Amino acid sequence: MEGTVKWFNSQKGYGFIIDSERKDVFVHQNSIKMDGFRHLNEDDIVNFELGAGKNGREQAINVQPILTRKMVEDSLKEEKLYVKTMKDAFGNKAYMVVDQNNVIQSSEQGMSFLDLAAYAGFDTEGLSA
C-alpha cells in the first residue's frame, strides 16, 4: 500500500505514515528498506505493508521510499536550484524553489510536494500525497 510520511524523528528512529484511508500507521526505522542511515522525511511517499511489530501491534513493515524530498532536492541541485519550505495562505506546509541568489523560481504561493516533484522533472502520475 502507498502512504505519505506524516513525521519521522530520526534521533528516536520512529514516526508515522498516513495511509490511503487517512489513518496514522506507526513506522520504526528497522522496517525501512534503504541503504545507509534509515530515515524518512515529512511528505516522503512510500510503499509499505501492514504487519505486527515486536509488541504485537499493527505497524508499517517493508517500507520502501518511492519519492523523497532528498531525491527532489538532489535533482534540483544539478540545476543549482534549492527547496525552501513555507506556509501557504491557509497555514499548510508548502514548497518553493529558489536559485543560488535566493531568487524565487517557482510560484510565490508555494506548491505541494507532488507539484514540487513534478517541477523537478519526476513523473508523479498515479501518486497521492
Where are these regions (language model features)?
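Short nucleic-acid-contacting surface segments enriched for D/E, G, S/T with interspersed K/R
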Residues: 34-47
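OB-fold/S1-family single-stranded nucleic acid-binding modules
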Residues: 51-67
